[in-house]
């Protein structure tokens, strides 16, 4: 177990060390035509991965591990021509390509069918920290085929060189227990306030806010592994289209 946690730490440090600071391209590329869709995309990225089943940990449970989300392509902005629409707040849509963000999350089981969680990450020039609560609508059941509904609420703060953001989301999750895996489906809403600190070509945008609300749906599978480990793989759909998320956690 100690070796596994050491490898996670080393991989995380390597990612930070060799990252390309992608989020620092914001001030060079943000425009009135792409800022709103960027706020929507950012909300979808931050809000993903807050759950991996519809089942709570239960009183005294604890879980920790790395998680990550990927957006395969950022949303198009507004504009009269294709080149303008493809110019995102991080650069040309095709050149930017997939956007990945990792973080470390810790969860703890509390009384009254409530779990609390905190998570944080710093990658490619953006730092995110936040947390939330999960509430099991029904009592946890070990019966195969049992449905487990859950409500999730979360809040985050994000900071980069040229922008900052606050983010709130709420989701409803439903999972079904099988012997070796747990499929889950969820839907939620992300609300993001984007504050612009720097805009090289549109200085009038500096100091202004953009407000964005977007829906997000998730479909995934959670697998119970040996040594109290869980592997979760999921696809989600938000304003930017298709994305993915994964986690590898250990339960105590």
Predicted feature locations:
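Hydrophobic, lipid-facing positions within transmembrane beta-strands of outer-membrane proteins
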Residues: 60-62, 100-104, 127-135, 149, ...
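Predominantly the C-terminal beta-signal and adjacent terminal strand-loop region
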Residues: 20-30, 211-213, 224-252
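Transmembrane beta-barrel domains of Gram-negative outer membranes and organellar outer membranes
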Residues: 20-141
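Solvent-exposed loop/turn segments connecting transmembrane beta-strands
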Residues: 95-101, 117-131, 158-166, 211, ...
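Transmembrane beta-strand segments that form the barrel wall of outer-membrane beta-barrel proteins
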Residues: 106, 110-124, 146-157, 174, ...
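Outer-membrane beta-barrel translocator/channel fold
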Residues: 151-222
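Short loop/turn motifs that connect adjacent beta-strands in outer-membrane beta-barrel proteins
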Residues: 53-60, 138-148, 179-181, 225-228
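Residues on the lipid-exposed face of transmembrane beta-strands in outer-membrane beta-barrel proteins
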Residues: 53-55, 66, 104-110, 131-135, ...
């Amino acid at each position: 177990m100690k070796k596994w946690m050491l490898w996670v730490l080393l991989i995380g440090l390597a990612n930070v060390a060799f990252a390309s600071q992608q989020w620092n391209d914001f001030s060079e590329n943000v425009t009135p035509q792409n800022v709103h869709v960027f706020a929507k995309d950012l909300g979808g990225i931050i809000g993903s991965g807050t759950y991996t089943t519809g089942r709570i940990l239960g009183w005294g449970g604890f879980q920790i591990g790395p998680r990550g989300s990927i957006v395969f392509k950022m949303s198009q902005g507004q504009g009269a021509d294709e080149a303008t629409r493809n110019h995102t707040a991080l650069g040309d849509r095709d050149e930017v390509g997939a956007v990945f963000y990792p973080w470390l999350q810790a969860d703890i089981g509390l009384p009254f069918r409530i779990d609390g969680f905190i998570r944080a990450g710093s990658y490619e020039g953006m730092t995110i920290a936040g947390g939330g609560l999960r509430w099991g609508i029904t009592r946890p059941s070990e019966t195969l085929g049992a449905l487990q509904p859950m409500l999730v609420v979360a809040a985050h703060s994000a900071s980069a060189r040229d922008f900052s953001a606050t983010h709130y989301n709420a989701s409803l999750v439903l999972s079904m227990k099988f012997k070796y895996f747990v499929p889950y489906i969820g839907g939620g809403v992300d609300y993001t306030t984007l504050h612009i600190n720097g805009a090289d070509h549109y200085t009038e945008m500096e100091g202004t806010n953009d407000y964005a609300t977007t829906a997000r749906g998730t479909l995934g599978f959670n697998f119970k592994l040996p040594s109290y480990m869980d592997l979760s793989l999921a696809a989600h759909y938000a304003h930017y289209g298709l994305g993915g998320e994964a986690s590898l956690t250990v339960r105590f």
